Amino acid sequence: MSATQKPAPPLGLAFIAAVLKKAGHSVQVIDCVAEAPDVYYSFKDGVVINGLSDKDIVDRIESDVDVIGFSIMFSGNWIHNRTLIDTVGNKFQNAVIIAGGEHISACPEFCFKQTTFLNVCVIGEGEETILELISAIQEEKDLSNISGIAFRSKKNEICFGTKRTRIRNLNELPRADWSYFPIDKYKEKNMAFGINTQDSISFPILATRGCPYTCTFCSSPQMWGTRYFMRTPQDVADEMEDLVTVYNSNNFDFYDLTAIIKKDWIIELCKEIINRDMNITWQIPAGTRSEAIDSEVADWLYRSGCKVITYAPESGSKEILRTIKKKIRLENMLNSIKQSSSRGLNVKINFMIGFPGEKHIDIIESIWFLIKASWNGANDMAPAAFSPYPGSELFNQLSNEKLIDMDDDQYFMDIINIDTFFENNFYNNNMSNYWLRFYLIFYLFIFYSSNFIFRPLRFFKTMYNIATKRYESRGEMTLGELINRSKVKIIDIPH
């Protein structure tokens, strides 16, 4: 459980449910968080799980099930998911156990090694793969002819199919099907990662897939590849309009890796939203191509209801940006931040600290960038400790240097703790963990103190928004969530 984020409807599962339903399969979805949103229990080493217990999950699975799938996007979830996989697999030994998601795609052999009952790993996009896989299971065919999977053979050998070709025409895919999910619970408990959704529900949207960039800390190439494909603005707006009609949604959170690459595309989407008079709000990440956000784009974003835009410089040091292959120009980003803020958008920036090779001088340059970003109008900032994700270039480098041991659960605990300040370990040999933890806190201090100095009234507005739960920024929502989590009662459940 993240201490700083609210649960959100699981978009990946909704895509898989949609293609299975269209193919005529009987589908059951267990949304483990939304079905028990008020339950928090201790798992291990201070990790707290929000949602159904393993026993409750097993009890909800239909007895005649043929295939059971797990969505595992984040490596930080693995230490619980591996236990759950074997608990479920032990109970339903005649069912085929499948897992997919970014973590699975990055390290399938490791996932097989750490579980007993996992049968198949889906690597990369799952919509086409899952249909072929289910068909082969039903007809008892050899799985070796299926692209995009790894599987455990009857001899307990790990076998790989060929790499699956990326899905190019995203418009042809069925839209995420939310009919299998307890959306009323998300609305009742305000469980969605959107801004100002107290009276409605925020839905995740994916308008594009892939990222053409190759940042060394990112694992997305294992899941999506580096080819970039877009839905048409009309198709995206159609989906948003349908969700407004069916679920009375008034907010949308775009999950794209790099949402804005083509200026014409984002302007066309804004026009579609305005012309349909949907009366919604939405949030979007700028991605690496921040120069695409000029005054014209920022104006269209604001007019269409976009409230929050997120930039991800990761560092204010040109040397660090070069080593992590983050292809941005800091001055262009500062100008884009200024344009977005001046048009009324809430601007959030993401920062990381503790990259291998990072030095004190790089930290000082980052601090100076934070001050300039604050001056240019950024009003929200999320710092995180660098953590090497499986499948990323930096992960492979550190693994080769014997600095990562995935068999040691401490590696996964460090991933869980990336947004905390006192428990994370770093992979930096130039500064001690104590220095880096200090800098992590100082990033927050220098950014928000300069922000309130430049705009004194904002402090009081922030306090009011948190008190009334009318959040206008990610930072306000995070602080409000931390306050709510401090009141949570944690129970002990036997494992």
Question: Where are the model-predicted features located?
Answer:
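Residue-level recognition of beta-strand->loop/alpha-helix junctions
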Residues: 31-36, 222, 256, 351-353, ...
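Glycine- and acidic-residue-enriched helix-capping/strand-helix junction motifs
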Residues: 2-13
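Flexible glycine/acidic-rich beta-alpha junction loops that bind and position SAM and/or redox cofactors
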Residues: 36-38, 108, 213, 263-264, ...
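Short helix-capping segments at alpha-helix termini
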Residues: 25, 89-95, 116, 140-142, ...
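Radical SAM enzyme core and accessory elements
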Residues: 64, 393-398, 406-495
